[in-house]
C-alpha cells in the first residue's frame, strides 16, 4: 500500500474547519506551461482578507470543500488542487482585487468546454463569503488547446469556399424576425442576396414556430440562394438556424441543410449549450458546412462589471468548442476604452498568438497553435454611414451584419442591400488608395451615392 493511501490503527484524524489560505494560497508557486490560468475579479464580504478569499476561490473551484475530510489522505492534493498564486488590487476600487488561480491540467476532461466551465465557474459563484465574483480571463495552455477541434473550417477555408477576398463580408438579419411565412421570408432573403449581400441570417429565436416551420424555411431560403447565385455569379448563403430542443433534432436540421447543398448553418451556442455546440461543430467539419454562432443570452452572463464572466472568456470558449463566425458587437460610437477592450477579444478570436496587454483587457498571453480563427461579426444598429469606421476598425477578416440598415431602406430590401455593397466597396477602394477613412468617410459615402442605382 502506498504511503498516501495507507491508514494506521490508532492514528487520529483531526476533523474541522480550517482557513483556505493554509492550503490554497501559494504566492511562491511558479506556474507551469500546462496550467490553466484564471483571473478573477473578487468582491469579498467585509472583513475578510484578500488572501483567504482568493484561496477560497481556488479551493471551491478545484478540490476544496468547507471542512477537512479524511479522504484527502487518499489522494495527492499538491498534484490536483487549484492555487491562488497572486493577488493584485483593482485600480480605483478599494473593495476589489484580482485573484490569479492556477489549475493543474489533469482536473479537466480533454476536449470538453462543458467540463472546463463546470469546474472553474460551476459552483464557486454562489459562495456566500463573496459579495461578487467575475471571471475576467483564462489562459488555455497549448496542451489543452490541442485536445479541441475548434472552428469547423476557419477564416481562410471560408474565403476559399466563398471565393471572396480582400474585403469584409456583408450580412443582413431578416426582419421582422418573427411572424413572416416561409415563402415571404424566402422572398426577403432573395432580395437581399440579389442586391449584393454575401449572407442573410435567421435571427436567434427563429427556430420552428407555428407560423414558419423549419423545413419550410430551409426550402424557401435554399431556393432564394440558388436563384440569387444564378443571377449574380457569386456564392451566397443564409444562416439557417439549426438550434432545436434536442441535440438529435439539431443534427437532423443540419443534415437537411447539407442535403439542400447550402453552405452554412447557425447555432445559438449559449442557450443551446457547449455540448450541443461542439457536436454540431464536429458535424459541420465532417460535412463541409460553415457554422455561424449567435451569442443570445450573453448579457445575462457578461453585462455586470463585478459578477459573471467577461465576454472574452466566452469568445475563447467558442473558439475551442467550434464556430466560424460569432457576434462580437460593434464599437461604432463607443468610448475609446471600450473599443480597445472589444478589439482585444476580436484579436483573440482571429489571431494565432496574442500577447498579454492589460490596456486591452488581455490578462494572459494566449497561443492558439493550429486552432483555426473565427470571424467576428459586427452587428447592432449599424448602417451605411458607419461603413468607413467599420471598415477601418474591423479590417477585412470580419462580417458586417446589418438588419434595419438593409431592410429599413425606403426603397426596399434590394436597394438597401445595394447601398450596403456600394458603401463597402467604396470604403475598401478608398482605403486601398491610401485615403483616411476616419477623416474622409462621409465624403467617400456621398461620392458613392452619386453612382449608386
UniProtKB/Swiss-Prot annotation:
Mg(2+) binds at residues 201, 203-204. The modification N6-carboxylysine is found at residue 201. It comes from the Eukaryota. Binds 1 Mg(2+) ion per subunit. The modification N6,N6,N6-trimethyllysine is found at residue 14. Its main location: plastid. The record marks 334 as: Transition state stabilizer. Its cofactor is Mg(2+). Residues 1-2 form a propeptide. Its EC number is 4.1.1.39. The active site is at residues 175, 294. It is found in: Plastid, Chloroplast. Substrate binds at residues 123, 173, 177, 295, 327, 379. The modification N-acetylproline is found at residue 3. The disulfide bond which can form in the large chain dimeric partners within the hexadecamer appears to be associated with oxidative stress and protein turnover. One of its GO terms (molecular function) is magnesium ion binding. It catalyses: 2 (2R)-3-phosphoglycerate + 2 H(+) = D-ribulose 1,5-bisphosphate + CO2 + H2O; D-ribulose 1,5-bisphosphate + O2 = 2-phosphoglycolate + (2R)-3-phosphoglycerate + 2 H(+). InterPro entries: RuBisCO, RuBisCo_large_chain_AS, RuBisCO_lsu_C, RuBisCO_lsu_C_sf, RuBisCO_lsu_fd_N, RuBisCO_lsu_N_sf, RuBisCO_lsuI. Pfam families: RuBisCO_large, RuBisCO_large_N. Keywords: Acetylation, Calvin cycle, Carbon dioxide fixation, Chloroplast, Disulfide bond, Lyase, Magnesium, Metal-binding, Methylation, Monooxygenase, Oxidoreductase, Photorespiration, Photosynthesis, Plastid. GO terms for biological process: photorespiration; reductive pentose-phosphate cycle. The keyword Plastid applies. Heterohexadecamer of 8 large chains and 8 small chains; disulfide-linked. The disulfide link is formed within the large subunit homodimers. Belongs to the RuBisCO large chain family. Type I subfamily. NCBIfam families: PRK04208.1. This is Ribulose bisphosphate carboxylase large chain.
Amino acid at each position: 500500500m502506498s504511503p498516501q493511501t495507507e491508514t494506521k490503527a490508532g492514528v487520529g484524524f483531526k476533523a474541522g474547519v480550517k482557513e483556505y489560505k493554509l492550503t490554497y494560497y501559494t504566492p511562491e508557486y511558479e506556474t507551469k506551461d500546462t496550467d490553466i490560468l484564471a483571473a478573477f475579479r473578487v468582491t469579498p464580504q467585509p472583513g475578510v482578507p484578500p488572501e483567504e478569499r482568493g484561496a477560497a476561490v481556488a479551493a471551491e473551484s478545484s478540490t476544496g470543500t468547507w471542512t477537512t475530510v479524511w479522504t484527502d489522505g487518499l489522494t495527492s492534493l499538491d498534484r490536483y488542487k487549484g492555487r491562488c498564486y497572486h493577488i493584485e488590487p483593482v485600480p480605483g476600487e478599494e473593495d476589489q482585487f484580482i485573484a490569479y488561480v492556477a489549475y493543474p491540467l489533469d482536473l479537466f476532461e480533454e476536449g470538453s468546454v462543458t467540463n472546463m466551465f463546470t469546474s472553474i465557474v460551476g459552483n464557486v459563484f454562489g459562495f456566500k463569503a463573496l459579495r461578487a465574483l467575475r471571471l475576467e480571463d483564462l489562459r488555455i495552455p497549448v496542451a489543452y488547446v490541442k485536445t479541441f477541434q475548434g472552428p469547423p473550417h476557419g477564416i481562410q477555408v471560408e474565403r476559399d469556399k466563398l471565393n471572396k477576398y480582400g474585403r469584409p463580408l456583408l450580412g443582413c438579419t431578416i426582419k421582422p424576425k418573427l411572424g413572416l411565412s416561409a415563402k415571404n421570408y424566402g422572398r426577403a432573403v432573395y432580395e437581399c442576396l440579389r442586391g449584393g449581400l454575401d449572407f442573410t441570417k435567421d435571427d436567434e429565436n427563429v427556430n420552428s414556430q407555428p407560423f414558419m416551420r423549419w423545413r419550410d424555411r430551409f426550402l424557401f431560403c435554399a431556393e432564394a440562394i440558388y436563384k440569387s447565385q444564378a443571377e449574380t455569379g457569386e456564392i451566397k448563403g443564409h444562416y439557417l438556424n439549426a438550434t432545436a430542443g434536442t441535440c438529435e433534432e439539431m443534427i437532423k436540421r443540419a443534415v437537411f441543410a447539407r442535403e439542400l447543398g447550402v453552405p452554412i448553418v447557425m447555432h445559438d451556442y449559449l442557450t443551446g449549450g457547449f455540448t450541443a455546440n461542439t457536436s454540431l461543430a464536429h458535424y459541420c467539419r465532417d460535412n463541409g458546412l460553415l457554422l455561424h454562432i449567435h451569442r443570445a443570452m450573453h448579457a445575462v452572463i457578461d453585462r455586470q462589471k463585478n459578477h459573471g464572466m467577461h465576454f472574452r472568456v466566452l469568445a475563447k470558449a467558442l473558439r475551442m468548442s467550434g464556430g466560424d463566425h460569432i457576434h462580437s458587437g460593434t464599437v461604432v460610437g463607443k468610448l475609446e476604452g471600450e473599443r480597445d477592450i472589444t478589439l482585444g477579444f476580436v484579436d483573440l478570436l482571429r489571431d494565432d498568438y496574442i500577447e498579454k496587454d492589460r490596456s486591452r483587457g488581455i490578462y494572459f498571453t494566449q497561443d492558439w497553435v493550429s486552432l483555426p480563427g473565427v470571424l467576428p461579426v459586427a452587428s447592432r444598429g449599424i448602417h451605411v454611414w458607419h461603413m468607413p469606421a467599420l471598415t477601418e476598425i474591423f479590417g477585412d477578416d470580419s462580417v458586417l451584419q446589418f438588419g434595419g440598415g438593409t431592410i429599413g431602406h425606403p426603397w426596399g430590401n434590394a436597394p438597401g442591400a445595394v447601398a450596403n455593397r456600394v458603401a463597402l466597396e467604396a470604403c475598401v477602394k478608398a482605403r486601398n488608395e491610401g485615403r483616411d477613412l476616419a477623416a474622409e468617410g462621409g465624403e467617400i459615402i456621398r461620392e458613392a451615392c452619386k453612382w449608386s442605382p
